[in-house]
Amino acid sequence: MLFLANPMSKDDIRSLPGVGPKTAEKLISAGYDSLIKIASASVEELMEAADIGEATARKIIEAAMERLGLLEFKTAEEVLEERQKTARITTMSKNLDSLLGGGIETAALTEFYGEYGSGKTQVGHQLAVDVQLPPEQGGLEGKAVYIDTEGTFRPERIKQMAEALDLDPKKALKNVYHMKVFNTDHQMLAARKAEELIRKGEPIKLIVVDSLTALFRAEYTGRGQLAERQHKLGRHVHDLLRIAELYNVAIYVTNQVMAKPDSFIPGLDSVQAVGGHVLAHASTYRVFLRKGKKGIRIARLVDSPHLPERETTFVITEEGIRDPE
């Protein structure tokens, strides 16, 4: 975990061994304009971006890592100290916050998956409002980026939720940056644009991607394209995780489900999240949502680095996400 306070200058790149003026120009134009971006790139990505050989790409990446101290081991005590810099954003449901260990964690990727109407998008809207609250109310006094792949973002809902929390609705709307994306390349570019906002000094503390996998499913339909789809999805998730860890930002993504073959039991055992192992291994927290009776939503924590698998309930009201009465 490495939180950056300030953006790296482009001059840092030019001082790396193996990076001449032409290579630097190619790297910068391809988006590799800082040491950390180069350090977190794969050898193949750098080879393609700068049109250089494998040995040169590896040398440049290792030099960037060395400059940033990424090749040094840390004690568990030091890691614990770094983790204490992370924060959490309330969902406005004490039940849901408790399930997640206090809310949506920064420097992590939280995935909510479930069928249509289970509440995934509503949670995303709620978080985009809640992140603006002061820390004593469960927020981070920050702004949100909302990457919308299915056209489900509604500013009217942001306004409604903000008013319920006594926030200035006009200010709340200005604190949410929305981008409607139309294909997977556009989606991946949106994540990089979000990083640019952060590097320019915007206090972005939350990035919502709703939905993470919809466009990938739409573009890569056949079995023959599955490997390509998973590779590209993996790169996108890697970008999101890098942003989360570098800038101490919370990433909230929604995901679709598909029926499990040979399953006849309704609920968790009858569906599985889209994205396969790529997403399963990348998500820090994974929550399955389903509808219960009388408007109740059931949330099950399926995966977490340190929390037990368990269930809780919440409701979606006019005011937003709340606990059942």
UniProtKB/Swiss-Prot annotation:
GO terms for biological process: DNA recombination; DNA repair. Keywords: ATP-binding, DNA damage, DNA recombination, DNA-binding, Nucleotide-binding. InterPro entries: AAA+_ATPase (IPR003593), DNA_recomb/repair_Rad51_C (IPR013632), DNA_recomb/repair_RadA (IPR011938), DNA_recomb/repair_RecA-like (IPR016467), DNA_repair_Rad51/TF_NusA_a-hlx (IPR010995), Hlx-hairpin-Hlx_DNA-bd_motif (IPR003583), P-loop_NTPase (IPR027417), RecA_ATP-bd (IPR020588). It comes from the Archaea. One of its GO terms (molecular function) is ATP binding. ATP binds at residues 114-121. SUPFAM superfamilies: P-loop containing nucleoside triphosphate hydrolases (SSF52540), Rad51 N-terminal domain-like (SSF47794). Gene3D superfamilies: 5' to 3' exonuclease, C-terminal subdomain, P-loop containing nucleotide triphosphate hydrolases. Involved in DNA repair and in homologous recombination. Binds and assemble on single-stranded DNA to form a nucleoprotein filament. Hydrolyzes ATP in a ssDNA-dependent manner and promotes DNA strand exchange between homologous DNA molecules. Belongs to the eukaryotic RecA-like protein family. HAMAP family: RadA_arch. This is DNA repair and recombination protein RadA. The lineage of its organism: Archaea, Nanobdellota, Candidatus Nanoarchaeia, Nanoarchaeales, Nanoarchaeaceae.
